């Protein structure tokens, strides 16, 4: 929910997940998170920042996703789910841990990106992506917190009816994070094959 991974069960695609059953308990095992944070069918920046926590699906009705719908229809499980979201906001965003981790990873790889002659983006584009990711994460956490405390609608219907209550994405541009299907060169980033990231030219809020 927080990372808005729509290349999964929660979107019209309903893909990239396993269901594991053991002793009558079912566990959902999602995978392929490279298009999280709105990288897949995410729409504009505002729709990603304010993705509704209580109807966390895209392009499909909740009733078509019973693994989510049945869970959130149960009051006890809904409260527990909200508790997990609050824990993530408190322990990864509100305390600065998310931003700290991104900056630490940037410090590890920044020089390698700068000197990589085969990179899919320029160094300036990479640095812009880092700062954009930090902004996106913090705005997303702000919206989730508002949805949890009731100041922001937590369903698609509620948000459509009250757009003025949503967190503003400002001039945040998701394409600054890169998008699949591009890259440099005639083979979309890879010699002899598709892949890679393309930067710039995307939609703002």
Q: Which role does the model predict for each range below?
A:
Residues 1-4, 9-11, 16-204:
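Middle-to-C-terminal accessory/interaction subdomains
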């Amino acid at each position: 929910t927080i990372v808005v991974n729509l290349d999964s069960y929660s979107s019209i695609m309903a893909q990239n997940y396993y269901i594991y059953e053991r002793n009558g308990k079912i566990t959902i095992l999602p995978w392929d998170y490279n298009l999280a944070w709105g990288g897949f069918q995410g729409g504009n920046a505002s729709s990603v920042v304010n993705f509704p926590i209580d109807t966390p699906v895209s392009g499909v009705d909740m009733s078509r996703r019973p693994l989510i719908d049945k869970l959130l229809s149960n009051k006890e499980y809904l409260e527990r789910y909200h508790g997990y979201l609050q824990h993530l906001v408190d322990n990864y965003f509100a305390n600065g841990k998310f931003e700290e981790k991104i900056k630490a990873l940037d410090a590890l790889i920044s020089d390698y990106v700068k000197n990589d002659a085969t990179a899919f983006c320029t160094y300036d584009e990479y640095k812009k992506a880092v700062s954009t990711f930090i902004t996106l994460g913090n705005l997303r956490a702000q919206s989730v917190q508002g949805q949890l405390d009731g100041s922001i609608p937590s369903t698609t219907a509620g948000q459509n009816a009250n757009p003025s209550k949503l967190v503003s994405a400002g001039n945040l541009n998701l394409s600054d994070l890169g998008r699949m299907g591009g890259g440099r060169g005639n083979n979309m980033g890879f010699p002899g094959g598709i892949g890679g990231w393309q930067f710039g030219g995307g939609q703002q809020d």
